[in-house]
Amino acid sequence: GSLRERRATSPASGRGSGAGDVGARVAVAARAWLGTPYRHQASVKGVGADCLGLVRGLWREVAGAEPEGVPPYSPDWAEAGGRELLREALERWLMPVSVEAMRAGDVLLFCMSPGVAAKHCAVLSAVEGPEPKMIHAYWGRAVVESWMGVWWRRRLVAAFRFPEEA
């Protein structure tokens, strides 16, 4: 079932020895995707991935089978559709967290243009240092790790965390 259903039937503490367990696993797993070529709609480490494909692949590695199928989508789906489809999917399966409480392993959601649905996601890979770092599928290139500079921070609209039972 959905995260809401799982939360209602599972202990609040989840499993594992601490709250950072799943986030640390996600961040480590994301680094293994670095260099994976950008491929629209793909989700295969070392072969191809887009931003959603990276998150889907990390889910498979950390939590198991994907919880729902992803219908085909065009590169301009956010501009054409108007609905917050990516945000809605993340809200179904991940736990929303405040931007101030973000930690490594959290999934970040970005809105690239005002008035358009949020359409890019990344994984926060490090919070220490001069500014945070993130791992994401860079359009037309590859999965990369980059600084989350001012340009990205201005476009950040939400953050989500993998459930502890993952």
Question: What residue ranges belong to the model's regions?
Answer:
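Active-site nucleophilic cysteine motif
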Residues: 43-62
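Intrinsic disorder/low-complexity segments
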Residues: 1-19
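Residue-level detector of flexible, active-site-proximal loop/helix-junction positions
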Residues: 45, 129, 141, 163-166
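Hydrophobic/aromatic-lined pockets within catalytic cores
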Residues: 34, 59-63, 126
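Short secondary-structure junctions
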Residues: 38, 93-98, 155-158
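Non-catalytic ligand/cofactor/substrate-binding and regulatory segments of enzyme domains
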Residues: 20-36, 147-166
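...with weaker cross-activation on analogous glycine-rich loops/strands in unrelated enzymes
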Residues: 20-27, 68-144
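Surface-exposed patches in mature extracellular/periplasmic domains of secreted proteins
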Residues: 38-43, 66-71
